[in-house]
Amino acid sequence: MKRLFIALLPLLLTFAAHAQRPTDIWYFGQQAGLTFAEGNTPKPLNNSKMSTYEGCAVATTAKGELLFYTNGETVWNRQHQPMPNGHKLMGMGISTQSALIVPDPGSGNIFYIFTVAPQGTPNGLRYSIVDMTRADGLGDLPRVNLLLIQPVAEKLAAVRHANGRDTWVVAHRWNSNAFVSYLVTADGVAAKPLMSNVGSMNTGPGRNAIGALKFSPDGRRLAAALWRETNKFELYDFDRSTGKVSNARGFGPYPEAYGVEFSPDGTKLYGSCNGVGGGTTQIWQFDLKTKAAALVGKSANRKIGAMQLGPDGRIYVAREDNPNLGVIEQPNLLGKECKYVDEGLKLGGRRSKLGLPAFVVDPKYGVRSKKKNVMSSAAETSRLW
């Protein structure tokens, strides 16, 4: 019996981890929403009170029950009402990744909302604290807009530390080639970041600050979209133990590069771009084994934006002012076999803008199989390049 238990222990731990569903609820765009809680096909939600052109974030319980959501300016509770002190956060919904929510590793009731201002403006990178024990369990913000660093680009991403407990929050300085990695522990948010000078300068006109930042599912790589006038995607290595970003590689030119996302198995990188001024919307796939680039999709929409991996293993693509999301159905597959569907998911009468919600990447969480309601982990993704 003891041998059987030892043999089954890894499987039991895997299922315990995957019973947690922190990315099942999405709110974004023009009061649009989705739930992934009822199987492999997401269903529209029409109860959102949030309008945001770009950035947004959602907090849930580990079981996927809504706690609150934000566009980086206002925070709404689970009853879709603004929190009492949740009106004046200093991110903006017109920033690519205006908000990101990180749970406090030492508490089930405290959350940090990180915000970045648009186009390298002085508001910079800040964080606000949400305490879910306040307002009769609906939550409120005892402290808001605590400055970390300024100015920054519109890039913001987070990944679980290698210890499986803490979290790295990564942004990019403006007028610099420096990534800044802040560690969030049970003691709070680190006052000083680890800086990594690597890759392209983020500088020039304020619009050059536009573009997303994403971690791979295993947390070992980081990708960025660099908008005008750089017009490219960059890939980096990331050390989850130290927070260091290194080894920059570029793909380009891709005019008005905006969104980035990795395939569930980490072997492909996807990027969205719109052409100068919009109107030439394209989705590119980069094979990280061969470095080959393939045009895998075009959109009838004038502009496309964020790309977000869903818990169902599909990648969803924001289409500006549109009642449908684009969907990459099989993102692990090479070239057009990945099957991009431009009007892939109806939003129940609501409209997408350019953003989709940001989440902390945790390698212990996987994606649900489309054929069976089981999970596959990113932990075994092989290192490439």
Regions found by a protein language model. Name each.
Residues 1-23, 256-258, 384-385:
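Bacterial Sec-dependent N-terminal signal peptides
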